[in-house]
Every structure is written in structure tokens, then in C-alpha cells.
């Protein structure tokens, strides 16, 4: 059986999706080898990985040369970024070393970085005519607001604004936050998507609701039937030109029946396992795209598929 090697960037806890990549590869006639790239080699991914490489920080100027050494030494075919900062690194590596012919299911770095800048992303969505919660501008008569750190993640640092006094606290710091209308009576829907890297063809979308989160990641999630969210996710990918694995976060205003984009992460979401079991085989789509094959278009994912994470232990002995 031919081998297919993956480099998981920041995928220390992605054991579940790692197993699904192995299964998808086997179904396509390949033996998958997973290599982790982490600051600490003693991580859960070691339970299924061939090796864990002690990596550099994403901001380290030597990271591209270090990843290239890893790619050439271990024969990596596909690089999978699993945390925000790794997406731009993976995309830039592919651009710097095109002769390696390593597949990265992500957009170019410029577009990826824009998605992780909430202000720049909101401006892009507005330019493309995509619906988002109205952005606050000085003087607007609205005091039901939410302020999100411009470069924040995992819901950290979010502040609700309910008074003029609270709003005044942001004077002089407006450029550090995205301030928008707050939707209190809402439903938040996550849509797992995949678009072919070369053509942009959307292979499939699968909406789900995060029932429980930890550290901003879904630990309990269920797939749902939401044609409106699915259609908006498809439109967002088409309008922005995003490629590869994409996670679209949508807010449904229940009072006014509005569907709007909260943010888009150009990578696999933490709860994507639910979408795979619901019928949208994301790992298979990524592998087929990497092999130059046309990924099989996913049918509508089954609603009501619930996944929940549980604790397990990986043991490392002194000589491991």
C-alpha cells in the first residue's frame, strides 16, 4: 500500500480527526502516516502519530526552513494547519517552496491573515455584500453592542456594552476592537465547508450547533438541517474566494430571522468530526484534492448526529 504523509501543525489534541484521516486514506488505497509539529512532543496526538517533531513558534523567523527540513526529511505530502496562527504559516510555506509540491488545503496567506483580523474581515464581508451584524461607528444611536478583540480568538476578551459609560471606555482604542450590534436572542451555527484549492468548487457544507465549548473549541456538537446557513456559507466562500477547509460561523437573529456571518476560519473546526460522521467526508475530500482527483460532492449531511469528546490518557515513559 502506498504511503501518504501528513504534517499536523498545532494538532496536538486532534486524535479523532487524525483517525478519520487514516481511515479515509485507507479507503482510497493509501497508508496514512501522521507527523505532529508541536512545541512539546509529549502530546495526545502521539497516540496515533508516527512521530512528533519538536517545532518552533509560529512567529519564529526560522520556521519556514525548519518546516522544509521536516518536509524533506520525512517525505511530507500534505500539511494540515489546526490553529489560527498555523494557517498563514502553512500557506506561506507552500508559496515559498512550490517545488516541494506539498498540498496545503488553505487560501493564500494574505487572505488567511485577513480572516483572523476581525476588522479587516468585517470590511471585506461588507464590500462583498455579505450580511454581518451592523458595525458600530461613532455617533450611532445603539447601546446594545459587543466588542471583540481585533486579533482575538477562542472568545477571549469579548466585552458586552450596555451603557454610554462602558462605550466611553473604548475611546482611543476603537482600532483594537471590532464593535458590532449585539444579538441577544440568537442561535449560533457553525458550517464546516470544503472548496477545491485549485478551482474553488465547493465540495460540500455541513451545519452544526456547538452545544458545549472549552477554550473556544467545540467539545459537544450536533449537526442540524439549516438551508439558510448552508446557503450563506456557500455564498461567503464564493464571494471571498476562500479555498480548502473553511469553517463559517453564522449567527441567526431569532427576533428578526436574520442570518449573518460572525467570522470565518480558514481551517478545519474542532467539531468537524460530527460533520464527517453525518456524511460529509472532509478527510477524503482533502486527500482526493491533494492527489489531483475531483473530490466527490457531498450530499446533504444528516441532521441530528451528535459527537462529544471525552478524556483519555497517553503515557510517556522516561526514554520515550
Please provide the spans of the model-predicted regions.
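Cysteine/selenocysteine-centered motifs that mediate thiol-based redox chemistry or coordinate metal-sulfur cofactors
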Residues: 294-320
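A short beta-strand motif that forms the metal-chelation/ATP-contact edge
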Residues: 146-148, 258-268
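Short glycine-enriched loops at secondary-structure junctions
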Residues: 38-41, 84-87, 196-201, 251, ...
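Catalytic phosphate/metal-binding cores of nucleic-acid and nucleotide-processing enzymes, i.e., regions
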Residues: 248
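Active-site nucleotide/adenylate-binding loops and adjacent lid/helix of ATP-dependent enzymes
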Residues: 98, 109-187, 193, 197-199, ...
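ATP-binding N-terminal substructure of ATP-dependent carboxylate-amine bond-forming enzymes
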Residues: 1-104
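ATP-dependent carboxylate/phosphate-activation module, predominantly the ATP-grasp catalytic core
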Residues: 174-175, 181-242, 252, 265-292, ...
Amino acid at each position: 500500500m502506498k504511503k501518504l504523509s501528513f504534517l499536523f501543525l498545532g494538532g496536538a489534541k486532534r486524535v479523532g480527526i487524525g483517525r478519520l484521516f487514516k481511515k479515509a486514506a485507507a479507503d482510497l488505497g493509501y497508508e496514512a502516516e501522521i507527523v505532529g509539529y508541536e512545541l512539546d512532543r509529549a502530546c495526545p496526538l502521539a497516540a496515533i502519530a508516527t512521530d512528533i517533531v519538536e517545532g518552533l513558534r509560529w512567529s519564529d523567523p526560522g520556521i519556514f526552513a525548519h518546516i522544509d527540513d521536516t518536509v524533506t526529511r520525512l517525505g511530507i505530502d500534505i500539511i494540515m494547519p489546526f490553529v489560527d496562527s498555523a494557517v498563514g504559516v502553512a500557506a506561506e510555506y507552500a508559496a515559498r517552496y512550490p517545488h516541494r509540491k506539498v498540498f496545503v488545503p488553505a487560501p493564500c496567506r494574505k487572505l488567511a491573515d485577513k480572516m483572523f483580523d476581525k476588522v479587516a474581515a468585517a470590511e471585506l464581508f461588507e464590500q462583498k455584500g455579505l450580511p454581518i451584524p451592523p458595525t458600530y461607528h461613532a455617533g450611532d444611536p445603539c447601546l446594545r453592542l459587543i466588542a471583540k478583540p481585533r486579533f482575538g480568538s477562542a472568545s477571549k476578551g469579548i466585552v458586552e456594552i450596555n451603557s454610554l459609560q462602558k462605550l466611553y471606555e473604548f475611546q482611543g482604542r476603537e482600532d483594537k476592537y471590532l464593535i458590532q450590534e449585539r444579538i441577544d436572542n440568537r442561535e449560533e451555527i457553525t458550517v464546516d465547508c470544503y472548496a477545491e484549492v485549485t478551482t474553488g468548487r465547493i465540495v460540500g457544507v455541513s451545519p452544526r450547533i456547538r452545544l458545549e465549548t472549552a477554550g473556544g473549541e467545540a467539545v459537544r456538537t450536533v449537526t442540524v438541517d439549516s438551508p439558510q446557513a448552508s446557503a450563506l456559507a456557500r455564498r461567503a466562500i464564493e464571494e471571498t474566494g476562500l479555498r480548502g477547509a473553511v469553517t463559517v460561523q453564522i449567527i441567526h437573529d431569532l427576533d428578526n430571522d436574520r442570518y449573518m456571518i460572525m467570522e470565518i476560519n480558514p481551517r478545519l473546526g474542532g467539531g468537524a468530526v460530527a460533520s464527517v460522521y453525518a456524511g460529509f467526508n472532509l478527510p477524503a475530500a482533502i486527500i482526493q484534492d491533494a492527489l489531483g482527483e475531483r473530490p466527490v460532492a457531498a450530499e446533504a449531511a444528516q441532521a441530528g448526529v451528535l459527537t462529544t469528546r471525552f478524556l483519555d490518557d497517553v503515557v510517556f515513559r522516561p526514554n520515550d
